[in-house]
C-alpha cells in the first residue's frame, strides 16, 4: 500500500532488487514484461530496512521453501483468513492498488506519474515508441508528495487516539 505496487511484486522483493542507499526497488520481471524501478518513500523504506532478509536474500520467503519467495496464493489465503476472522475489512489485494491510486491523486501526484509508479502500460505512440526517459526524478517527486500525505494521515490518526 505504501508503494502502490502489486502485492506479488512486493512479495518477490529480494536483496538484489533493493538499493537501500538510493531507496529504489528495481524489478526486471513484472506483469507487463517491462523492467520497472520505483523510488521508495521514506515511510516504506523504513519498513523495508526493518526486515531482515533470509539467507537466500528474500524479504518475504516461503515457509515451505526458503529458497523461494512467498507465493501470491499464500498471500491471498492469508488475506482471506484475516477477513474471515474480522481482523481486516473485506478487501482484495487489487483494492490496495486502487486505494493507492486514488489517495496518491488526492495527495497531488499527477495521473501520468501514478501510472508510471504503478507500471501501467502507456499505450500512446509517443510513450510506446519514442519516450525512453525513466521518469525517476518525477516518480521521486510524486513519492515525496505521497509520503507527506501518508505521514499527515498517520499523525492525524495518532492525535485522534490520544483524544479518545
Give the ranges of each region predicted by the language model.
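Active-site/catalytic core of tyrosine-dependent DNA strand-transfer enzymes
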Residues: 39-89, 95, 100, 108, ...
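Short, polar N-cap/turn motifs at the start of nucleic acid-interacting alpha helices
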Residues: 16-24, 88-90, 109-130, 152-161
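Catalytic-site neighborhood detector that most strongly recognizes the C-terminal catalytic loop/helix
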Residues: 27-33, 45, 66, 118-155
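Conserved tyrosine-mediated DNA breakage-rejoining catalytic core shared by Y-recombinases
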Residues: 3-50, 121-125
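Hydrophobic, well-ordered secondary-structure elements that form the walls
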Residues: 40, 101-104, 114, 130, ...
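Short pre-functional
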Residues: 1-8, 102-106
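DNA-binding alpha-helical recognition surfaces that contact promoter or target DNA
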Residues: 12, 77, 103, 116
Amino acid at each position: 500500500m505504501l508503494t502502490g505496487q502489486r502485492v506479488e511484486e512486493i512479495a518477490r522483493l529480494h536483496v538484489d532488487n533493493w538499493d537501500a542507499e538510493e531507496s529504489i526497488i528495481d524489478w526486471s520481471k513484472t506483469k507487463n514484461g517491462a523492467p520497472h524501478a520505483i523510488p521508495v518513500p521514506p515511510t516504506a523504506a523504513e519498513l523495508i530496512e526493518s526486515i531482515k532478509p533470509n539467507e537466500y536474500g528474500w524479504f518475504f520467503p516461503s515457509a515451505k521453501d526458503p529458497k523461494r519467495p512467498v507465493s501470491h496464493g499464500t498471500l491471498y489465503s492469508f488475506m482471506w483468513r484475516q477477513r474471515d476472522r474480522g481482523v481486516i475489512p473485506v478487501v482484495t489485494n487489487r483494492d490496495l492498488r486502487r486505494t493507492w491510486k486514488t489517495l496518491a491523486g488526492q495527495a497531488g501526484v499527477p495521473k501520468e506519474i501514478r501510472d508510471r509508479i504503478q507500471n501501467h502500460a502507456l499505450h500512446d505512440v509517443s510513450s510506446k515508441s519514442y519516450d525512453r526517459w525513466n521518469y525517476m526524478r518525477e516518480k521521486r517527486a510524486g513519492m515525496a508528495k505521497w509520503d507527506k500525505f501518508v505521514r499527515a494521515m498517520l499523525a492525524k490518526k495518532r492525535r485522534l487516539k490520544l483524544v479518545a
